[in-house]
């Protein structure tokens, strides 16, 4: 990358914590190199306490865009000038575009599109399917929206934090009004309802942080009877590549287990196009993810 850097190099950033595990710098910098673009992508360790200063830095330095990850996806909303319709509906942002570097910041959400493209890549269709989704943070809400827009029959949401239930219920109400998908919300503490939902589902999606450090030894599913030969299990965590949930599901005969690498690739590709205005060469980038 040092050979490409010049006085004209444009910067794209990632604002998150922790960031050491992130694949985004590798993906985006390789894409810039493949396309011959004079851009550089850097990750910055930024939590909610530093977020306002970091966003002002995007404006002041003319940074062309930024990806946003935990814990900043919702906290960044009041710091932006505009939101895309999807980001406004979800109430979270993972991509910020600074058009022409002029300081007008627009927030977008690409997690849902990325997740559904990753599932399609594995031959998994959500149309007319019953899906249980655990975790309704920024990524989980984005996935729920995309599942409804793509024609899922039912989306059964379960949340770990009771404090989120009321705010997420507003999204549930909107999705039930805007789409034909039946969307429900329950507390993950209700294990009876959770297990019943999985038993009736074609696809289980874990959009929580369970499975990644420091929770790498935990799994939301521990009952072998919940794993069926016709159940697909998708964990959006990608580090480790096989979470305890995915290992458990594979060992007990799930139809398919899918980690978060594909979602990272495709949400990144969507973000790349929003910021750069060109398609990411995903076929060239995809093999790099297997190196991690």
Swiss-Prot record:
Statement: the UniProt record of this protein carries the keyword Oxidoreductase: yes
Enzyme class: oxidoreductase
Enzyme nomenclature, EC number: 1.1.1.25
Catalytic residues in the record: 73
BP GO terms, sorted: amino acid biosynthetic process; aromatic amino acid family biosynthetic process; chorismate biosynthetic process; shikimate metabolic process
CDD domains registered for this protein in UniProt: NAD_bind_Shikimate_DH (cd01065)
Protein's pathway: Metabolic intermediate biosynthesis; chorismate biosynthesis; chorismate from D-erythrose 4-phosphate and phosphoenolpyruvate: step 4/7
Keyword Amino-acid biosynthesis: yes
Key words of the record: Amino-acid biosynthesis, Aromatic amino acid biosynthesis, NADP, Oxidoreductase
Binding-site residues for NADP(+), renumbered to this chain: 135-139, 236, 260
GO molecular function: NADP binding; shikimate 3-dehydrogenase (NADP+) activity
Residues annotated to bind shikimate: 22-24, 69, 94, 111, 238
Family from the record: Belongs to the shikimate dehydrogenase family.
Functional summary from the UniProt entry: Involved in the biosynthesis of the chorismate, which leads to the biosynthesis of aromatic amino acids. Catalyzes the reversible NADPH linked reduction of 3-dehydroshikimate (DHSA) to yield shikimate (SA).
Quaternary structure (record): Homodimer.
Name the record gives this protein: Shikimate dehydrogenase (NADP(+))
Gene that this polypeptide is encoded by: aroE
């Amino acid at each position: 990358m040092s050979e490409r850097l010049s006085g004209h190099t444009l910067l794209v950033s990632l604002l998150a914590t922790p960031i050491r595990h992130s694949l985004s710098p590798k993906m985006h910098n390789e894409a810039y190199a493949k396309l011959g673009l004079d851009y550089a992508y850097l990750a910055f360790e930024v939590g909610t306490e530093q977020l306002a200063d970091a966003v002002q830095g995007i404006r002041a330095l003319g940074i062309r865009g930024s990806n946003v990850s935990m814990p900043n996806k919702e906290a960044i909303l009041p710091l932006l000038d505009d939101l895309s319709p999807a980001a406004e509906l979800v109430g979270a942002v993972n991509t910020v575009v600074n058009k022409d570097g002029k300081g007008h910041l627009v927030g977008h959400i690409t997690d849902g599109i990325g997740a559904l493209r990753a599932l399609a890549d594995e031959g998994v269709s959500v149309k007319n399917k019953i899906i249980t989704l655990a975790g309704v943070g920024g990524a989980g809400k984005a996935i729920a929206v995309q599942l409804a827009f793509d024609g899922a029959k039912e989306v059964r949401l379960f949340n770990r934090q009771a404090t989120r239930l009321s705010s997420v219920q507003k999204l549930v109400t909107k999705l039930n009004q805007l789409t034909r998908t039946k969307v429900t919300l329950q507390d993950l503490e209700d294990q009876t309802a959770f297990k019943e939902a999985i038993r009736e589902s074609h696809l289980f999606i874990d959009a929580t942080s369970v499975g990644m450090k420091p929770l790498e030894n935990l799994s939301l599913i521990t009952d072998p009877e919940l794993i069926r030969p016709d159940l697909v299990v998708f964990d959006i965590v990608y580090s480790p590549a096989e979470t305890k949930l995915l290992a458990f599901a594979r060992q007990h005969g799930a139809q398919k287990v899918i980690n978060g690498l594909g979602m990272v690739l495709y949400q990144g590709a969507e973000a790349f196009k929003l910021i750069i205005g060109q398609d990411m060469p995903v076929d060239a980038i995809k093999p790099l993810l297997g190196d991690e």
